[in-house]
Design a protein with these regions (language model features):
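Class I S-adenosyl-L-methionine
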Residues: 51-69, 76-224
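Short intrinsically disordered terminal tails
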Residues: 1-8, 220-226
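SAM cofactor-binding core of SAM-dependent methyltransferases
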Residues: 11-58, 71
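A generic structural signal for short
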Residues: 9-10, 86
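N-terminal cationic amphipathic segment used for targeting or macromolecule association
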Residues: 3-9, 32, 184
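Short, well-ordered coil/turn elements that cap or connect secondary structure elements
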Residues: 6, 27-29, 42-44, 64-65, ...
Length: 226
């Protein structure tokens, strides 16, 4: 699986979608491989179409031997406000994914939305205002197997959010959700010029991934040196 690695630290991004987290990790110096149950033709790095839990199971030995970091973004619909409104049935994957990652022993990050806070262990919150991008986009990140993330200072939200479904005016922050207008601007904000509208809606902004990757890289070097 990792023939192209050639000594570079490897990260595997589960539930990768179109690769926002992956691109951030790549910018931090990892060689990244994406895994998603749905084919992702826009994903910009080596890609494996597979169920995440099955992938962990049948690639466990190879992952332990070669992988330095695993990130996972289980579907968030179960925890979203939309789910509470329409009562659709979605799988609860945070617990099973955590158990599988803990069994591997590889440093990991699990990402999800704010409404999943009670399901995550001591998560760090990231916001676009921390990175100077024009979307607030709060996301939570749990870490484990020796990896930790520091909680950045959370700046006040001074810019106004554009109303849902309306194009953001100059100085307004974007809601990158649903059938939003302004795909090109959203691509710029998220750092994903290759992404589709749906991919942007589901993505972790690239600056978040790079920040996580930089912290992980320094810690992983320390772990592997022991």
């Amino acid at each position: 699986m990792f023939e192209e690695a050639m000594g570079a630290p490897v990260a595997v991004d589960l539930f990768c979608c179109e690769g926002g987290m992956s691109a951030g990790l790549r910018s931090a110096g990892f060689l990244v491989y994406g895994v998603d149950i749905t084919y992702q033709p826009r994903y910009p790095f080596p890609f494996y179409q597979a169920d995440a839990l099955s992938f962990i199971s049948y690639k466990a030995s190879e992952l332990r031997a070669r992988c330095s970091l695993i990130t996972a973004s289980p579907p968030c619909q179960l925890y979203s406000k939309t789910h509470r409104i329409n009562r659709s049935i979605y799988p609860d994957l945070i617990g099973p994914v955590r158990a599988a990652l803990e069994s591997l022993g590889i440093p990991y990050v699990i990402e999800n939305v704010e409404d999943a806070r009670t399901e995550l262990r001591n998560p760090v919150t990231l916001c676009g205002a921390m990175f100077g991008i024009e979307t607030y986009r709060h996301r939570l990140f749990e870490t484990g197997n020796g990896l930790t993330l520091s909680q950045p200072m959370h700046p006040p939200h001074r810019a106004r959010n554009a109303k849902m479904g309306r194009k953001a005016e100059p100085g307004e922050f974007m809601h990158i959700v649903g059938n939003f207008p302004g795909v090109d601007r959203a691509r710029h904000i998220m750092g994903m010029p290759w992404a589709s509208r749906n991919g942007l809606c589901e993505a972790v902004p690239v600056p978040y991934g790079m920040w996580i990757g930089n912290q992980a890289m320094s810690q992983i070097h320390g772990m592997e040196g022991k």
